[in-house]
Amino acid sequence: KRQGSYNMIVAMSKVLEKAGGFQTVNVNPDSPGGMGAPYLFASGNTDLAFINGAPAKWAMEEGTLGKPATSGYAAVIGGLTAVCYINCVSNAFLQKYNVSTIEEIFEQKLPLRIGCSAKGSMDAEGAYLLLEYFGVTEDDLKSWGGSITNQGGDANADAIADGQIDFYIDHTSSASSTMAQIATSVDVTFLQWGDDLCSWFVSEKGFDLITIPANSFKGQDKELTLPGTPDCVFCKESLSEDVVYAITKSLSENRDALVAEYNSLSPWEPETAWEEMKRGGCPLHPGAEKYYKEAGYMK
């Protein structure tokens, strides 16, 4: 999954070299995960990075992953992807306990075995945020007979098929291959979360609400609206206005070619890429603002 982001960044760097007049753009393949990415700028070696909007804001305000708050970065392009907390639970679990919602599962203290990615990823953060919302610790969950297992997508798909986990959550899009694989191999229900839970993610955590069309996955016959926070391009705050203007302009003007290469970028609309919700409420770099105003997208 991070591989996908890496490939998109390489494609963007080629645009900057060809169309943006930048000599060489080096891409570092190391990714600290969505929650750690804001800290890349503190080292001084990073000029541009892909970060989800909400954790970029959390890192500025209170810090993430137990680290102190950080700064030194600003938004360039928001809303590149339409990703959200797609989640599914095995029908065997729902039938066994006669429940149909995530709220009932937590309120009844059921032994839910959760599968998600590595700690520090935006994917796993969804599981920990659910616990936070319901006022439950990981020890509480264990005392009910539940658990959180951190592992890769394929391992989670195998685990839910083998009955080792009951619930899988990922910060992903309607094009998720892991969700598609699970839906075709196991009887699962894709859960729509209640209004209170979704609103908490928006008002307390800076998420947006993203709609996943009906029938994106086998057995998912209703559309889902779930909290998510889009991938964004952030830059080092100290980059000059001219440089960031040139970056924003060349990427925005080559949006169609990039989307043709990477369909997951199709939600990116330069006309709205500056909007606050699209960038997690983080400050916009003045160079990016200059481009959006000049293009007539921003007043």
PLM feature spans:
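Bilobed "Venus flytrap"/periplasmic-binding protein-like clamshell domains
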Residues: 1-30, 85-162, 274, 278-287
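Extracytoplasmic/secreted proteins, especially bacterial periplasmic and envelope-associated proteins
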Residues: 4-11, 15, 36, 40, ...
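An extracytoplasmic/periplasmic, membrane-proximal ligand-sensing/linker region
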Residues: 8, 162, 167, 172-184, ...
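Active-site catalytic pocket residues across diverse enzymes, especially alpha/beta-hydrolases
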Residues: 16, 20, 45, 63-64, ...
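Loop/turn elements at helix/coil->beta-strand transitions in domains of secreted/extracellular proteins
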Residues: 21-23, 45-48, 71-74, 109-113, ...
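N-terminal segment of the mature folded domain
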Residues: 33-84
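Pocket-lining segment of extracytoplasmic ligand-binding domains
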Residues: 53-55, 61-64, 71-77, 92-94, ...
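Ligand-binding clefts/hinges and TM-proximal coupling segments of bilobed small-molecule sensing domains
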Residues: 100-129, 208-272, 276
